[in-house]
Amino acid sequence: MASHKEIVSSFVEGAPPGELADVVADIKALTSSTPNLLNELGPAFQKYNEEQFTTVKLPGGSQPVIISSHSSLEDGRYYDVESSSSFAYDHITQKASDVQSHVLEGEQTDLVKSTVKGLSAYVKEHFPNAAYGAYPIENDTKVAVVIVANKYSPNNFWNGRWRSLYIYDPSNNSIEGSIKVDVHYYEDGNVRLLTNKTVTATVSSGTGSGIAKEISVNEKKYQEELNKSFTSLSEGAFKGLRRQLPVTRQKIEWDKVASYRLGQDIGGGSSRR
């Protein structure tokens, strides 16, 4: 049987995008008799932050940087290539401190920097709120590329996150990675979309701009696949679950259902007063 610590750790690790603070508040309320339990969950918070590519703004900085296992240094510090800095990070409070200069050195330095430059143009064009990074890994023999985009709309009861991770191998110009989408909708219900798309590709040029371009092509293709899947679900499986007449005894224009606010427009009035 799992211990209380293991159970609570699973709550932290499974927190939906943008809702970790809410999960922590619930944990505090549920474990008020053991107030020190939260301080024992450091490994769970670290796993969440690194796997979810949590972003943080450095003191004095304007752009978010990524927390990941690929950007990790020793003693709880992380680094960012674009700002040439390293920093301490508190996984529980999600705050950065003690920013220091960090100059990247190694065989893949030029490739990493050119990849970051290529990613900058791509991300700024296609994502309204995103962070990106490239890091040498596996004894400087490969390059990890990370992109994360968050969209939080708690007033409309939904939050979402796009995460993509790619490993580029210069020895054969190959890219292997995955794109993960996590969306949580929780107005008068609890629906969570989780997707995981495996990506394999080749960068014939072997350059940073070529890596960014190949990533762009694959992510655009996956976005189109997602859009088609949503349309197929709406017109197929979901349509078969719909009532001919809902409990309101009024027919619903299902082709416009995406524009309805659940609990308000469907119910014919405000769901919260």
From Swiss-Prot:
Family, per entry: Belongs to the F-actin-capping protein alpha subunit family.
Principal cellular location given in the protein's record: cytoplasm
Known role: F-actin-capping proteins bind in a Ca(2+)-independent manner to the fast growing ends of actin filaments (barbed end) thereby blocking the exchange of subunits at these ends. Unlike other capping proteins (such as gelsolin and severin), these proteins do not sever actin filaments.
Domain of life from the UniProt record: Eukaryota
Organism from which the protein derives: Neurospora crassa (strain ATCC 24698 / 74-OR23-1A / CBS 708.71 / DSM 1257 / FGSC 987)
Subunit field text: Component of the F-actin capping complex, composed of a heterodimer of an alpha and a beta subunit.
Name recorded for this polypeptide: F-actin-capping protein subunit alpha
Claim: Cytoplasm is one of the keywords in the record: yes
A Pfam family reported for this protein in Swiss-Prot or TrEMBL: F-actin_cap_A
UniProt-listed InterPro entries: CapZ_alpha, CapZ_alpha/beta, CapZ_alpha/beta_2, CapZ_alpha_1, F-actin_cap_asu_CS
Signal peptide segment: none
Gene Ontology terms: biological process: actin cortical patch organization; actin cytoskeleton organization; barbed-end actin filament capping; mating projection actin fusion focus assembly; mitotic actomyosin contractile ring assembly; mitotic actomyosin contractile ring contraction
Annotated GO CC locations: actin cortical patch; cellular bud tip; cortical cytoskeleton; F-actin capping protein complex; incipient cellular bud site; mitotic actomyosin contractile ring
Subcellular location: Cytoplasm; Cytoplasm, Cytoskeleton, Actin patch; Cytoplasm, Cytoskeleton
Gene Ontology MF, one: actin filament binding
PROSITE patterns for the chain: F_ACTIN_CAPPING_A_1, F_ACTIN_CAPPING_A_2
Keyword annotations from UniProtKB, A to Z: Actin capping, Actin-binding, Cytoplasm, Cytoskeleton
